[in-house]
A protein has these predicted regions:
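Positively charged, low-complexity intrinsically disordered leader regions
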Residues: 4-96
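Phosphate/diphosphate ligand-binding glycine-rich loop within oxidoreductases
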Residues: 76-166
Length: 166
């Protein structure tokens, strides 16, 4: 007989209070909804949080709280959308946070974690790779050691790119 069954061992995850005073429903009440601020984000490249003003950031936090407060309602806004996750620098937490969020919102992911498996290894420029990404995905998240990588790729992208760090 299985040793665990003999001892009646049950494994349960404790549910920690990760919110403290910042529970999503409290956040929803404290920030007035103003969707006008989010309209400017449609199909926009995200290079740095510095590019957003306070009002846009507050509306993003409010939207995130809406998703978290009612995850069943927001299960598929990215259905049919493909994220190209190009992490040319090791970063497990950052990569998985982007991929998990995209997946939880109903999207699909194409993940590249090794520069040597791309055309870059054969001498293609990031601009060339960006042109290829236009044909396969709806959004790119890029992390690279080179600070100019995002701007190099932006030259040829017709889809949004998110800078995941460099």
């Amino acid at each position: 007989m299985n040793d665990f069954k003999e001892r009646n061992v049950e494994f349960q995850r404790a549910v920690p209070d990760v919110y403290g005073d910042a529970h999503p429903k409290g956040l929803l009440k404290s920030i007035q909804e103003d969707g006008e601020h989010l309209k400017q984000l449609s199909s926009q490249h995200i290079i740095s949080s510095d590019q957003f003003g306070r009002d846009v950031l507050l509306q993003l936090f409010r939207l995130a709280a809406k998703f978290e407060a009612n995850p069943q309602r927001f299960r598929t806004p990215l259905q049919g959308k493909i994220l190209i996750s190009a992490f040319y620098e090791p970063s497990t937490r950052t990569r998985l946070s982007f991929e998990s969020a995209w997946h939880r919102l109903g999207g699909d992911i194409m993940s590249i974690t090794d520069r040597s498996t791309t055309g870059i290894a054969k001498g293609e420029s990031l601009s060339d790779v960006g042109e290829m990404f236009n044909n396969y995905g709806d959004c790119v998240v890029l992390r690279d050691t080179n600070e100019s990588s995002v701007k190099d790729m932006m030259r040829s992208l017709r889809i949004p790119i998110i800078n995941a760090g460099n």
